[in-house]
Amino acid sequence: MIISMILGLFSGLFAVSMMLGLNDQRMNSAVNSYLSHIQIHHPSFSENFDIKHTIQNLDSLDFSLKNDQSIKAFSSRTIISGMASTAHGSEGIRLIGIDPTSESKVTNVHTSMVKGTYFNSIKSKPALIGKKLAEKLQLDINKKIYLTFVDENGDQQRIKLKVEGIFKTASTLFDRTNIYMKREDLQ
């Protein structure tokens, strides 16, 4: 009787410890992969990722962040909802325009590459895509992907990117819905 109580108690403690550890691991993975520690958005941006809702006076904010000694690193991003398509299908995606150097200081996507490189080899409009999206659209390195989205003027835009790298994070949803490209290529 006492042995079964002790075994039950240890089993319960083990289960709780395991759940807490998995929760911590999942949270750390999300923060390091794509959330980062803090995000600053226009108050209305999160409602539907509308590109019209951008931060005003971005240069002033950049200056403040660069000169704040308590901030280790930061990265500006342009985030747009859109559609990715290939000859093998299409998928709703979130397009993330980044500066590769500053982004590598706040996320670990550059270390999550399973194929290709992190903005090193393709000079004209490279893209990084998640492994799940690559599988769904049957994409590989150096293959073309077309992205369609609405710009800040309400006009539909279509751009062609070339897959430079394929990443895999702990989140298959993130890997299936996100594409990284250079911010300068969105201008």
Where are these regions (language model features)?
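Extracytoplasmic
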Residues: 33-35, 88-93, 114, 124, ...
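Hydrophobic, regular-secondary-structure patches
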Residues: 12, 17-94, 117-123
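Short beta-strands and strand-coil junctions in structured, solvent-facing domains, enriched
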Residues: 46-48, 80-84, 101-104, 134-136, ...
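Short, charged, solvent-exposed linker or helix-capping segments at domain edges/interfaces
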Residues: 51, 105-109, 158, 175
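N-terminal signal-anchor/signal peptide hydrophobic helix marking the start
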Residues: 1-9
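Basic-flanked hydrophobic alpha-helices used for secretion and membrane insertion
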Residues: 132, 139-187
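Short beta-strand boundary microenvironments
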Residues: 96-137
